[in-house]
């Protein structure tokens, strides 16, 4: 299964492509590619430009996140805290205890306290 994650931020459009060969849940997805694109105040133009450079039919899932701009597109979306929590589950290394995650964006600085 191949997935595309899009973050529509205050100053950039970021994307990550991930793949998971075994969908039974025993294998973690692996990052295939990622990119960041400054949108200079025009996230729609930047998003369309980046999407036009991809073969969207090659993705089984596409989802977007972002505080404000994700609400203006017709894609499945999740909140930033939910996406951060989900992603952290895949990148956390065993034996590492992390009390919080910092999300430092173009306009918003957030600290997510983990329990």
Predicted regions: what they are:
Residues 1-27, 98-115:
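Gly/Thr-rich phosphate-binding beta-strand-loop-beta motif of the actin/hexokinase/Hsp70
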Residues 3, 52-54, 92:
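Short amphipathic alpha-helices and their capping/turn segments at secondary-structure boundaries
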Residues 5-7, 54-55, 61:
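Short secondary-structure boundary/capping segments within folded domains
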Residues 9-12, 40-45, 78, 82:
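Electropositive phosphate-/nucleotide-binding environments in soluble metabolic enzymes
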Residues 15, 30, 50-51, 61-67, ...:
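N-terminal cofactor/phosphate-binding cores enriched in small/glycine residues
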Residues 26-58, 69:
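N-terminal phosphate-binding loop and adjacent alpha-helix
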Residues 58-60, 97-98:
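Local beta-strand N-terminus motif with an aromatic residue
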Residues 68-115:
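Conserved phosphate-binding catalytic cores of ATP/NTP-utilizing and phosphoryl-transfer enzymes
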């Amino acid at each position: 299964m191949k997935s595309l994650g899009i973050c529509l931020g205050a100053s950039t459009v970021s994307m990550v492509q991930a793949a998971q060969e075994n969908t039974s849940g025993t294998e973690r997805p692996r990052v295939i590619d990622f990119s960041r694109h400054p949108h200079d105040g025009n996230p729609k133009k930047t998003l369309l430009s980046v999407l036009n450079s991809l073969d969207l039919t090659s993705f089984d899932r596409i989802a977007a996140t972002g505080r404000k701009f994700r609400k203006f597109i017709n894609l499945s979306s999740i909140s930033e805290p939910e996406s951060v929590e989900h992603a952290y589950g895949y990148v956390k290394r065993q034996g590492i205890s992390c009390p919080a995650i910092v999300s430092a964006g173009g306009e918003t600085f957030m600290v997510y306290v983990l329990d």
